[in-house]
Amino acid sequence: MTIRYFSLGRFAMREAFSLIGVGAGDLVMLPSYICRDVLASVNERGAKPIFYDVDSNLQPKFLDPETKSKAIIAVNYFGFPQNLEEFEKYARSCGSVIVEDNAHGLLSRDENGNLLGQRTDFGITSFRKTIRTPD
């Protein structure tokens, strides 16, 4: 596992998209409830955001395997882990790369004790969202 440090989560997201090779015209799946900086990172690459709905527990309602995205963002809202089973199933079906956005979950773990932000192809965790740090 390689760990890189960035001053802001948006810079980490940009780097993840760069390493994945997200470019003009590529599809990136995002939850309909998302930070504008994540959306900006998609738009900066010239990629097309595709939104999936989340339920009242902020879990994905439906990930359409017919929509072939280059990357899919799984957000651990407020440090609560996403159930990655649906994301992994989707990624296997179309070759998509999962980015785990754990900006609000510093040191949070899932029910198996795994650190959030380290369970997928790419993970992003932010000190700034949990511990006030300057820009």
Question: Language-model segments: what does each one mean?
Answer:
Residues E100-P134:
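Conserved active-site segment immediately N-terminal to the catalytic lysine
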Residues M1-A16, L30-P31, Y52-D53:
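Short loop-beta-helix segment that forms the pyridoxal 5′-phosphate
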Residues R10, P134-D135:
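Conserved glycosyltransferase catalytic-site signature
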Residues I3-Y5, P49-F51, I98, G123-I124:
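Conserved beta-strand scaffold positions in the cores of enzyme catalytic domains, especially
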Residues Y5-F6, F80, T130:
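Aromatic-acidic/polar surface patches that form glycan- and anion
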Residues S18-L107:
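PLP-dependent aminotransferase-like
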